[in-house]
């Protein structure tokens, strides 16, 4: 973990709310700490959120959000090999419906819809959650990724836009919300706004690979290939080491090499990274 993130990971935790004040059904304090650790891993792509969540629910099998989050995180991997584990996590959460709050019940519905291929309905369910709990970082992250997978540029921008007023720098994970907003603006061709917000996110959290990714898109779309290459290389130690999203950002660097007709460098990245 990044030290400043982990130091604040247990900020304002209680048995009933997470670090952003979002309600959670009663659980062990250690379970909520595991949830926060996994959420940081999920947002930052540093570490394995599913590994953390598996250990958390093993220690507390009745932790509803642990099962819901584990299913949701695996769903975002979009790999068939995880389907049995996803189904098990969803069924575990469903079996605890008697102790689930309304938010958790809706998140279970979203996970079930997503598993069964109803991606649009899953996004509607996440939106229902966000209408009541705009600081639900897991819900906004899942919905944003699903907008990404579905190519829904308008919701990449507007879904974050509907909740951003409830976030500010003192709220844990704010930089990642800005990074999502920046990418949404870029996908809607609002490049200046995207660049401004991505840079703001990186001022708060320099290791945010998604914000670097948003900037790479801006520079690719504006033909700023040399600047884009310099961006990726100068920030390599922020976004590349031990980051699960690094392979995609390496691909963006390869694109900048290709734009310069530096094909050997692009091929070398393909072979080595």
What are these regions (language model features)?
Residues 14-33, 93-104, 169, 173:
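TPR-adjacent "capping" and linker segments in tetratricopeptide-repeat scaffold/adaptor proteins
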Residues 28, 35, 68, 107, ...:
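TPR/TPR-like alpha-solenoid signature
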Residues 161-260:
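Internal metal/ion-chelating core segments
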Residues 52-54, 83-96, 120-130, 154-167, ...:
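Alpha-helical repeat scaffolds
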Residues 10-11, 32, 37-54, 58-62, ...:
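Inter-helical turn/loop elements of alpha-helical hairpins
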Residues 30, 62-66, 102, 136-137, ...:
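Residue-level recognition of tetratricopeptide repeat
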């Amino acid at each position: 973990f990044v030290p400043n993130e982990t130091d604040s990971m247990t900020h304002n935790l209680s048995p009933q709310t997470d670090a952003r004040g979002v309600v959670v059904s009663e659980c062990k304090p250690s379970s909520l700490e595991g949830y926060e650790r996994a959420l940081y891993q999920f947002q930052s792509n540093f570490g394995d959120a599913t590994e953390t969540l598996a250990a958390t629910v093993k220690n507390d099998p009745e932790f509803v959000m642990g099962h819901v989050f584990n299913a949701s995180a695996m769903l975002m991997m979009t790999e068939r090999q995880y389907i049995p584990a996803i189904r098990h996590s969803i069924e575990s959460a469903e079996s605890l419906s008697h102790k689930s709050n309304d938010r958790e019940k809706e998140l279970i519905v979203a996970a079930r819809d997503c598993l069964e291929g109803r991606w649009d309905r899953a996004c509607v369910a996440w939106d229902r959650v966000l209408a009541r709990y705009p600081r639900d970082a897991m819900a906004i992250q899942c919905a944003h990724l699903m907008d990404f997978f579905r190519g829904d540029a308008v919701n990449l921008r507007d879904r974050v836009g509907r909740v951003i007023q409830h976030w500010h720098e003192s709220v844990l994970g704010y930089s990642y919300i800005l990074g999502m907003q920046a990418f949404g603006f870029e996908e809607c061709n609002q490049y200046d706004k995207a660049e401004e917000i991505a840079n703001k996110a990186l001022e708060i959290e320099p290791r945010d690979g998604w914000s670097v990714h948003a900037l790479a898109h801006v520079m690719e779309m504006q033909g700023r290939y040399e600047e884009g290459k310099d961006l990726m290389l100068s920030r390599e130690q922020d976004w590349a080491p031990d980051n699960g999203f690094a392979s995609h950002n390496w691909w963006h660097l390869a694109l900048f090499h290709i734009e310069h007709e530096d094909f050997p460098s692009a091929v070398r990245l393909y072979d080595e990274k």
